[in-house]
Amino acid sequence: MKLMNSPLLSIVTLSWDNQPYTEAFVKSIRENTTLPYELIIVDNGSAPETQRWVQEVADRALIFAENQGFPGGFNQGAALADGKYLLMANNDTEFPPHWDVRLVETIEKYPNAGIVTPAYTSGRKSALRFEPGDGIKIIGRFRKYPSGVAFFMRKEQFHHVFGGWSMEYAVASGEDADLCFTVWKKGYEIVVDERVLVIHEGKVTSQSKLADWRVHFRANSRQFKRKWFYYFYFPYLARMTTPRHRKAFERV
């Protein structure tokens, strides 16, 4: 059900050519979303024919002549959102029936959830990253974090508590881990809804269009580890709850 006047969900994705993947994403959203929603597509400098297509199929389209990057594109798309909840998903994903109802159920059941993510599999490697099942799983803080394949969040919390996506990272990776660590540092949890299995091709855009992808990846990895050094290397200390330890980590 699409209801532009008062959407419950704002679904945001990025486009940078690779139109067939975005078409499959849009098809899965249109066919499998039952709650009121709006679809926002941010085009990061695609060819003119792809940009025209984006304007035709999106409920709201943001068209840029140059690539704004992953965090920049999602931040600008989220700024347009009218929904109570945000789904920020890669354009090389496909969503199953009932995904929206189940993710809303989960985020409303867990008021301390900062991010709800579905289970997902890589279409290229046929390897599950978070296995599907019947339950809900809370990820241990400052440990294994989910990739930013599909983050489902409360819009106001995303903007005003977590501050959106960090702009410290280049176009390859790192911003999803940064947002997860920010959520944990603010005292919230990351929850996996195993009932929703999303098909994800995996780095279709970045690896196909960036000749120096690995260079960016290594630079972003160094930036992330510098910023989150104590949380990354000493997670057991970060999970301590004594006032003295909390005060020490607040200074990081």
Predicted regions, residues:
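Donor nucleotide-sugar recognition loop
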Residues: 94, 143-145, 159-199
